[in-house]
Regions:
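Glycine- and Gly-Pro-enriched alpha-helical subdomains that act as flexible
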Residues: 123, 127, 131-136, 150-162, ...
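Conserved short S/T/G-enriched processing/targeting/catalytic segments and their helical context
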Residues: 37, 41, 50
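Conserved active-site and cofactor/substrate-binding residues in soluble primary-metabolism enzymes
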Residues: 27-31, 48-51, 102, 123, ...
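Acidic/Gly/His-enriched mid-domain segments of enzyme catalytic cores or analogous surface patches
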Residues: 45-135, 139
């Protein structure tokens, strides 16, 4: 199994992906998504703009919106920001979420036509690696979304490094990778404590490896791109270009 790295904000054209793409956004898109699934969310619909989110919400009864603008502030009028801390104690059982963010969701949609697309974050890294290994792909593309002109994106690079070690069959100590999330440029902004949209609790929740035993797989259902939790045993081990997770029709 080969791996390669791509950086979302360096791409001029979308390269042809081979087999599996993992779109990584540790701070915070796909950490927030993981906590939403843990709170009971049935599905997450990624969309590119706030206007699309509002339009889709009207078509999906009882759905909720979550997201942030560049820099991390919540999208005005949304039910939730892009914050795992904001979901603490919230019951999302059976609800559908609509998510828009400047990095993770944009990266996910950029590779919407890839054979298999996972949303990656540190909190479900091991489960993601386990799901990918079961697919036996020839190549895995790791897409770093958090690198910007003023941010090194090392929180996502650390997650990619951890995933690579896991995919190689290793048993790496997650602690150094967790520390890199905290010490990244964006991580230090949360630690500074001077921006209410970037709470320290979010950093604490995002910089924890392997909290959850599910991967997050993006699939197309009824014409929409949907993110779903993929738990151990739900993956039908077939060639990667014919992947079908058992039970997904029950979640959408």
């Amino acid at each position: 199994m080969r791996t390669r790295r791509l950086f979302l904000n360096r791409l001029e054209a979308t390269p042809e992906p081979q087999d599996v793409v993992v779109v990584i956004d540790v701070l915070r898109s796909f950490s927030t998504a993981a906590y939403a699934f843990t709170a009971g969310a049935a599905a997450i619909h990624p969309v590119e703009t706030a206007a699309e989110a509002i339009e889709l919400q009207q078509a999906l009864p009882q759905s909720l919106t979550t997201g942030a603008v560049p820099g991390g502030d919540p999208v005005p009028g949304f039910d939730f920001g892009n914050s795992p801390a904001a979901l603490a104690g919230v019951d999302l059982q059976g609800r559908k979420l609509i998510q828009t963010t400047a990095a993770g969701v944009r990266g996910l949609l950029r590779f919407a036509n890839a054979p298999s697309v996972f949303a990656g974050s540190l909190v479900c890294a091991r489960a993601t690696a386990d799901a990918i290994r079961r697919l036996q792909p020839r190549q895995v593309t790791l897409l770093i979304t958090g690198e910007w002109a003023d941010r090194d994106g090392d929180e996502d690079v650390a997650c990619a490094d951890y995933l690579e070690a896991l995919l190689a069959g290793g048993t790496p100590d997650p602690a150094p990778y967790e520390q890199r999330v905290r010490r990244s440029d964006f991580g230090r902004r949360f630690a500074a404590g001077d921006n209410p949209s970037l709470p320290l609790l979010d950093l604490d929740l995002c910089a924890r490896a392997d909290c959850f035993h599910f991967a997050m797989l993006a699939v197309r259902r009824t014409g929409r791109f949907v993110l779903l939790p993929l738990r151990s045993g739900e993956l039908d081990v077939t060639p990667v270009d014919r992947i079908f997770p058992a039970g997904i029709h029950q979640l959408t």
